[in-house]
Amino acid sequence: MEPLIGMGVLALIGVAATIAGASEDLESDIGSQSNPNSQVQLAPQMMFPHRIFNKAISGEPPSNALMCSIGAAIATVLISEFTVSPLFALVFGSVIAASVHATFAVTATMGRCASQSRFKQPIYLDMIRSHTPAIMGYAFITTFCVLIVSYLMTVVLGHPFPLTMLAFIWGITIGAIGSSTGDVHYGAEREFQQFEFGSGLNASNSGNIVRYAESGLRNGFDNSWFCSKFGGPTTGIAFGMTVFLGSWITTIFDPAQGLSMGWLSVIAGVIIVLILIIWNWKIEVQARKAYGPYKEDKAEEASA
């Protein structure tokens, strides 16, 4: 393959991965999944009923791995056995995967809310009806973009793994990145905006999540809107960089061209990792110097 064509394919893969990362994080925000959902689950038990979609089907890595694997398996069957257009096969597989994901989401939130009836937590059917299509939409975008990445890597770049295996791996990866990157914006900031920023969360405030929005009661749409400003784009950039840089190394230094090129790809990968570690350390040090530790108010110090 010509180097320019390979770089063009990598650019397309990077764009698709960035979109997939952003939509994955926003899907977990609107449906409340992964780590922050522990506070949503705890809220009714602390006498704080809410209108937050409480699905948390599983951790994001296995949830997205299942979703992407289903879409890839269906697309593979349609392409290989029925000679269907790859684009149609990827779209159809993504629709089925999003439908399965929505089914799990509805049963999960209804089961969780029903189990908390003793704590006066209602089941808001209007909330479920309004949130489920949005969850399906985000799930479709995530699955479709991951399938595009996997298909291009398999067919164009000649990756040895089959489409379903690649989709499974990227599903785990995108779920892990969304859980560790974007969910921090939702769980550490959006859920507890009534407490002063930087003060941390006292154990006595566990479950005391924000339940009232700018107008009316807060729901998943409010959380998704807020996290689309930072958490979603950050997750998209993180996943896009992971996919692009991981494939860029072996495209520039193709191990198939010889042992020396293989070692050059390893060295390039190590250098990139070291640069990212140092960059992250610099950002953390700068943030600590700029904002410092949390300081108590003078009134609090006087009363103490």
Swiss-Prot record:
Its EC number is 7.2.1.4. The keyword Secreted does not apply. The keyword Transmembrane applies. It is a multi-pass membrane protein. The chain crosses the membrane at residues 3-23, 77-97, 133-153, 155-175, 233-253, 259-279. Keywords: Cell membrane, Membrane, Methanogenesis, Methyltransferase, One-carbon metabolism, Transferase, Translocase, Transmembrane, Transmembrane helix. Pfam families: MtrE (PF04206). One of its GO terms (molecular function) is tetrahydromethanopterin S-methyltransferase activity. InterPro entries: MeTrfase_E. It is found in: Cell membrane. It comes from the Archaea. GO terms for biological process: methanogenesis, from carbon dioxide; methylation; one-carbon metabolic process. One of its GO terms (cellular component) is cytoplasm. Pathway: One-carbon metabolism; methanogenesis from CO(2); methyl-coenzyme M from 5,10-methylene-5,6,7,8-tetrahydromethanopterin: step 2/2. It catalyses: 5-methyl-5,6,7,8-tetrahydromethanopterin + coenzyme M + 2 Na(+)(in) = 5,6,7,8-tetrahydromethanopterin + methyl-coenzyme M + 2 Na(+)(out). The complex is composed of 8 subunits; MtrA, MtrB, MtrC, MtrD, MtrE, MtrF, MtrG and MtrH. Belongs to the MtrE family. Part of a complex that catalyzes the formation of methyl-coenzyme M and tetrahydromethanopterin from coenzyme M and methyl-tetrahydromethanopterin. This is an energy-conserving, sodium-ion translocating step. This is Tetrahydromethanopterin S-methyltransferase subunit E. It comes from Methanosarcina mazei (strain ATCC BAA-159 / DSM 3647 / Goe1 / Go1 / JCM 11833 / OCM 88) (Methanosarcina frisia). The lineage of its organism: Archaea, Methanobacteriati, Methanobacteriota, Stenosarchaea group, Methanomicrobia. The gene is mtrE.
